[in-house]
Amino acid sequence: MIRFLAKGLIRDRSRSLFPLLAIIITVTLVIFGIGFMEGAMNNLLQSTAVISSGHVKVVTKAYKKESNQLPNDLALFDTKNIIHTLSHMYPDYFWTPRVTFGGLLDVPDINGETKEQAPVFALGIDFFSERSRQTEIWELEKYLIKGHIPKSRDDALISTKLAKQLSVSVGSSVTLIGSTMDNAFTTYNFNIAGTFDLNKGQADRQMMLVDISGARQALDMTGAASEILGYHNSLYYNDEEA
């Protein structure tokens, strides 16, 4: 029976070739489409994980309810011990504290008076720990336009859009005007170590990145963090595991 069908297909190529080509093309397109969608989805999830959520996130219940207001008075305390516990409970993930805050960036003139001012969305991330992978996660070596990665707690990276708005460049000094985790008024000086462009449109328009030690110093948050983010060791998001 099989031999009979094979002979029929060979003798009448018009009935065998075109259906075979149609099947091959269809299967190829389906495989390509699935691969493309999985890649695009993982890229989207990775972008979201970097900027806001991690693959998993630990916050206080109170902070979660008011997270859009960046309520650092509801932050996590004793984060070092929390991260130690999480690392033992979930060894497939690595954990990093983050301080998320907003305020105004003030640029003084030669007389110390305000020359330029703009709102800022700032993230205090762990640049300096021995096992930190933040530079890798943010791909800063790829997106850094000018300057260098922060080397001290007073160094800051700002987006090229924000640098243009404030008319500042690498080496300039800016003053953060904001509030501490106890809602007290605070000012803190940062030195612009570099500028970056994440190519994420409005998401990084007013963004500033500093080391978490500088953020804690500026906001009086010793040992505290707005949130603790967890990333899978492979940096690939797995919804079932999360």
Segment roles from a protein language model:
Residues 61, 65-66, 71-209, 213-223:
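A structural signal for hydrophobic secondary-structure junctions
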Residues 56, 162-163, 224-242:
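A short beta-strand structural signal in non-transmembrane regions
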Residues 23, 54, 59-63:
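Short, conserved active-site loops that position catalytic residues or coordinate cofactors/metal ions
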Residues 1-31, 35:
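N-terminal Sec/SRP start-transfer signal
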Residues 28-58:
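Alpha-helical transmembrane segments
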